[in-house]
């Protein structure tokens, strides 16, 4: 994989774009530690190491942090991670971790949402909101 571009996201993190279409966010110290530079080749073993030692764990920590304040659907969590430049492999790993430990359950979320909002919103509004959150009509 070739590092196409490194763009700062904030003071501490940068977006690393690989092969012009695949992006991931790393802290500047991690970029230095793995000697990642624009135009250079990123060896597969280095990528695997970054994925396994950093990104998979960070994705799980991020979704747990997001769930701390309020329940979310699988789709909402996937979108948040994607917006945070987590690769698909890390997103899938984090979602599977949550499902395995029963931190997320879209069916249960939908049931609680309907129960809570049934007196305040119409049936159609509730259906629309649940579809927007990634849940089916049922």
Go through each PLM region and give its residues.
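An alpha-helical, amphipathic repeat domain used for nucleic-acid recognition
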Residues: 1-138
